[in-house]
Amino acid sequence: MSDHPNAALARRIGEAFNSGDTTAMADALADDIEWHEIGRAEPIVGKAALAARFGMDSGAPPPYQITAELHDVIANDDHTISLATAHATKDGRTFDYRVAEIYHIKDGKITARWAFSDDTQAINDFFQGA
């Protein structure tokens, strides 16, 4: 059985994220993306603002690295839910956490993303200042 097209899109953006392929990541996002991060009250709105947040516009690497091991993707015509374990490194420290991501998808592009975890406070503490 083949993946739903939106599940395949979620898998592709996960692979692009893990490999640092910012072009593939940007191609998967709508220009007016709403990006909701774990532990942040306000979303990042727009591809340009998201690129600035992650340093993609400067060419400089971010002060941390994150990869995710995808466990499952559930999809329909409007949404995907991805379950993963994230592995982060920052300033010589490492941190693993579970994450659920929900994508709203329209016309083959991710228009909104929400991320949730089992320990928001630990995530905020780890990434403080980033």
List each language-model region with its residue ranges.
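Low-complexity, intrinsically disordered terminal/linker segments enriched in charged
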Residues: 113-130
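Short beta-strand segments enriched in hydrophobic/aromatic residues
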Residues: 29, 86-88, 101, 117
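Short, surface-exposed coil-to-beta transition loops
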Residues: 66-68, 95-100
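Short, cysteine-centered beta-strand-loop-beta hairpins and adjacent loop/turn segments enriched
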Residues: 60-63, 88-96
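Hydrophobic pocket/interface hotspot
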Residues: 10-13, 24-29, 33, 46, ...
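A solvent-exposed, acidic/Ser-Thr-rich amphipathic alpha-helical stretch
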Residues: 22-78
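A short hydrophobic beta-strand element
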Residues: 76-86
